[in-house]
UniProtKB/Swiss-Prot annotation:
Positions of transmembrane segments: 20-40
The protein, known as: ATP synthase subunit b
Gene Ontology cellular-component annotations: plasma membrane; proton-transporting ATP synthase complex
Function field: F(1)F(0) ATP synthase produces ATP from ADP in the presence of a proton or sodium gradient. F-type ATPases consist of two structural domains, F(1) containing the extramembraneous catalytic core and F(0) containing the membrane proton channel, linked together by a central stalk and a peripheral stalk. During catalysis, ATP synthesis in the catalytic domain of F(1) is coupled via a rotary mechanism of the central stalk subunits to proton translocation. Component of the F(0) channel, it forms part of the peripheral stalk, linking F(1) to F(0).
Organism annotation: Chlorobaculum parvum (strain DSM 263 / NCIMB 8327) (Chlorobium vibrioforme subsp. thiosulfatophilum)
Membrane topology: Single-pass membrane protein
Subunit-structure text: F-type ATPases have 2 components, F(1) - the catalytic core - and F(0) - the membrane proton channel. F(1) has five subunits: alpha(3), beta(3), gamma(1), delta(1), epsilon(1). F(0) has four main subunits: a(1), b(2) and c(10-14). The alpha and beta chains form an alternating ring which encloses part of the gamma chain. F(1) is attached to F(0) by a central stalk formed by the gamma and epsilon chains, while a peripheral stalk is formed by the delta and b chains.
GO molecular function terms attached to this record: proton-transporting ATP synthase activity, rotational mechanism; proton-transporting ATPase activity, rotational mechanism
Family stated for the protein in its record: Belongs to the ATPase B chain family.
Compartments in which it is found: Cell inner membrane
Amino acid sequence: MLTSGIILLSGGLLSPNPGLIFWTAVTFVIVLVILKKIAWGPIVSMLEEREKGIQSAIDRAHTAKEEAESILKKNKEMLAKADAEADKIIREGKEYADKVRSELTEKAQVESQKMIAAAKEEIEQEKRRALDVLRNEVADMAVKGAEKIIRTTLDADKQKAVVNDMINEMAAKRN
């Protein structure tokens, strides 16, 4: 403790020494001049180059962002056009399918009406043929019956027997 008291009384560490201050300032100025002459230029130029590089990177980033936004806008427009085209194609396909379906339905109806008309005509012709055949058979039966009646004079029992014989003959011919 005694030594620390002596240092404090004789000026010590905290008391300013004008000679030391002067030489410290001179040394600082010399170092500053040397640094300015030797190192300041390269440091400043390096900082300027760094600043230019950063600014260039920022500019490139802005340009890339603008290009990306432009491409995105074009892509959205192309997608919208593609969607519109797809909707148009789908709509046209549905319209075409509806048209084809209605044409096929109409053709089928016309064909079915033709087939029905042809079938009715064929049935009518068969009916006429059957009636003609029936008329001919009835006429033949009437002629044969009249012929038999004329050949024989019949009483009621004989007439019934002749008619039954004729009916049986006709039935046998049909089968």
